[in-house]
Swiss-Prot record:
E.C. numbers: 4.1.3.39
Protein known as: 4-hydroxy-2-oxovalerate aldolase 1
Family annotation (Pfam families): DmpG_comm, HMGL-like
Keyword Metal-binding: yes
Taxonomic source organism: Nocardioides sp. (strain ATCC BAA-499 / JS614)
Amino acid sequence: MNAHQIFVQDVTLRDGMHAVRHRIGLDDVRRIVAALDAAGVDAIEVAHGDGLAGSSVNYGPGSHTDWEWIEAAADVLERARLTTLLLPGVGTIHELKTAYDLGVRSVRVATHCTEADISAQHITAAREIGMDVSGFLMLSHMAPPAELAKQALLMESYGAHCVYVTDSGGRLTMNDVRDRVAAYRDVLDPATEIGIHAHENLSLSVANSVVAVETGAVRVDASLAGHGAGAGNCPIEAFVAVANLSGFEHGCDLFALQDAADDLVRPLQDRPVRVDRETLTLGYAGVYSSFLRHAERAADQYGVDVRELLMECGRRGLVGGQEDMIIDIALDQVGAVAS
């Protein structure tokens, strides 16, 4: 790919699951996938918000299984690449192979930004069965550029075709993104692609995605109406508009994406996906975006300020998988007030 040709991956039906508490009907999945496919996106990711086998008490139960969602997507998909997400320790190689049997041809293997070594088995297994594989270094703001690049190099050594700067907390500024993508490019093989996964918590998702492309990223995550955890992901319709103005080459139809965002996705949201006092605090504190709904429930249950709860999550450096700690923090805050 040349410097301005991009690969647009939609995450409405994976990261967007967080925005609806992992509850979406199969007919809605089919409608959204068909619309995305017709609008020209390159890949469509489908899974529980926390990846294959993520449905649980800790992360939140899904309304359907991953397999039901994936089968519904595969039923109507004609052109785009069907993709999924896997977190080692949550999903297994068995689940990966089942997804492949159902038509998934690309997977992102996700770890915390300093734990790339735990992705080795899963990346290797995905390559062995013939999948396109990306490494997904979550909460990328928690590692400086040089350290993050070392982790990306590990994922490349295991066989990843692409490694992402994954701004799970929506905490990265444009300079932060530029520095991390440049650090990747300095150490990765020229054939290894770089991806950007942005969140809107600081209202920088489109800007950060554009900066990433200008610095060397090829794969860009985005979602209809920004449907995703926290304040959402990079809104695909806004990004495509800016991509057109910036001269990036892609195959997406802007108006078709606008229609799908407004007609199919916004009506599903039981809580507006937007920058507000709670989601802005996520980005400011550097907290995993999917903590939002968990923190709001805990704050309501124990009568604490959700912003103070999120700030303490940030101070403690909580990472994905530690959602249960949110209640402990809320109880600590209640105790501090009582004393």
